[in-house]
Design a protein with these regions (language model features):
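RNA-binding accessory domains that recognize and position tRNA/RNA substrates
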Residues: 1-182, 195-238, 307, 355-360, ...
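Active-site adenylate/phosphate-handling loop in enzymes that bind or generate adenylated species
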Residues: 128-133, 166, 171-178, 245, ...
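Structural beta-sheet core signal
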Residues: 183, 207-209, 242, 287, ...
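Hydrophobic/small residue at the entry helix of a nucleotide-binding pocket
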Residues: 189-190
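A conserved beta-strand->alpha-helix junction
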Residues: 228-254, 342-344
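Small/polar glycine-rich anion-binding or flexible loop at a beta-alpha turn
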Residues: 293, 341-349
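A short alpha-helix-loop-beta-strand transition element characteristic
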Residues: 333-341
């Protein structure tokens, strides 16, 4: 039997005249994800992406796992291809899916015909194939409303495709079709989730992290690298920029009002991120901020943060509560790494009672009293370490 993977379009199918661009981008991504598994022929027709192995002994379990994490597919299935003769369809369905019918009590056959020249109607095909399978498995009953298993037959131009229930995909749009942004990766729970959600909308991402040794450790840096690697499974390859932030942070601590420290630090980070983002051709910044979660994430504080630089700041978590964020972090397998107890620079020097409704005028006044900050920020941006993050299943962090 000739097994292939089918990927079904979702939102992409609504793109009208630009649809070909999205499909081309999607096929490029699928080929890249599959190239380490084996040689695959990837093509698109009738709103479906076909991933057909061209070698024997390809690990189809691994291939399916790889492409199931690609944004742009509403659902997927592993299918077997056969001729469109009805007897061949019956025999192939039994050979491919017969074992899946053992141990269940109810099933249903679904049929779709994009090849309208096929001599049987969809209801006829469902009825006759269902009768054939009942003859092979007389303990089964048909349940068209809530079956335990579905046998699906798709009659297409190039043959009959037989498979079980579709598996939900990640949805969204192919990464890179919406531009590029720089994600503020702190090491906590929120920022990897923010990267995941923006990549789902088609953004290619680089990451930026602020390190403040000796207050933050090398283990904290490795943790952030691990988070970038974990998100790469969904977001694709990226660059991680690690900014040496000790000097600017100490300068703000020593020269600014204690209650304004957090907002002043965030504005400083945004200015540095702005420089690196533009250098990389990024069109926006991404943060994991959620409204009112901490003192720096009130409306007033966010207003002050936004005013520090001129790129759009995308906040995909802004209306999510922590429970929703944690659920997504578990889904993308970043939660357990995020909660490892290593300090990040956002938590050091934090005042006990930060101002939650700062006014921009007082922030600008405080910055005017720190004339040496701009030079320290420029130095930090210039000395940022670039780490290339490639898509990997092997995360380089234990701790």
């Amino acid at each position: 039997m000739h097994e292939i993977i089918l990927g079904y379009q979702g939102e992409m199918s609504l793109k009208g005249l630009n649809r070909n661009q999205f499909e081309s981008a999607m096929m490029k991504i699928l080929r890249y994800r599959l190239k380490t598994v084996g040689k695959f022929k990837v093509y698109c027709t009738q709103s479906t992406f076909y991933m057909e192995p061209e070698e024997e002994d390809v690990d189809m379990d691994l291939a399916f796992d790889r492409v199931s994490k690609v944004f742009g597919l509403a659902s997927l299935s592993r299918a077997v291809v056969c001729g469109k003769d009805f007897d061949t369809i019956c025999q192939t369905a039994e050979e491919y899916l017969g074992a899946s019918l053992h141990g269940i009590r109810t099933f249903k056959v679904e049929a779709r015909r994009s090849d309208k020249s096929y001599p049987m109607t969809s209801p006829e095909l469902m009825r006759e194939l269902g009768a054939y399978l009942l003859g092979k498995h007389n303990y089964l009953k048909v349940d068209v409303h809530n079956p335990q298993f579905k046998v699906i037959v798709e009659i297409r131009d190039y043959g009959a495709y037989i498979h079980g229930p579709k598996v939900p995909g990640e949805g969204g749009l192919p990464v890179g079709t919406s531009g590029r942004a720089l994600n503020m990766l702190s090491g906590g729970i929120d920022s990897p989730v923010a990267a995941y959600r923006m990549a789902k909308r088609g953004l290619a991402l680089d990451h930026i992290h602020f390190a403040s040794p000796p207050y933050t450790s090398e283990r904290a840096k490795l943790k952030v690298k691990a988070l970038a690697q974990l998100t790469s499974i969904y977001t694709g390859s990226s660059n991680l920029f690690v900014v040496p932030y000790t000097k600017p942070q100490e300068y703000i601590r020593d020269n600014a009002p204690d209650v304004l420290f957090t907002v002043l630090m965030r504005r400083s980070m945004m200015r540095i991120a702005n420089v690196i983002a533009k250098r990389q051709g990024c069109e926006a910044l991404v943060t994991g901020e959620s409204l009112a979660q901490v003192a720096s994430q009130t409306v007033k504080a966010l207003q002050c943060t936004d005013a520090a630089q001129d790129l759009p700041i995308l906040r995909p978590l802004i209306g999510m509560d922590k429970t929703e964020i944690v659920e997504t972090a578990r889904h993308i397998n970043t939660f357990e790494t995020s909660i490892r107890p290593y300090e990040d620079c956002c938590t050091i020097f934090t005042p006990p009672h930060p101002k939650i409704r700062p006014e921009l005028e007082e922030i600008l006044e405080a910055e005017a009293a720190m004339p040496g900050l701009a030079a320290l920020e420029a130095e930090a941006a210039e000395n940022a370490e670039r780490i290339r993050i490639r898509i990997t299943d092997q995360v380089e962090f234990e701790g």
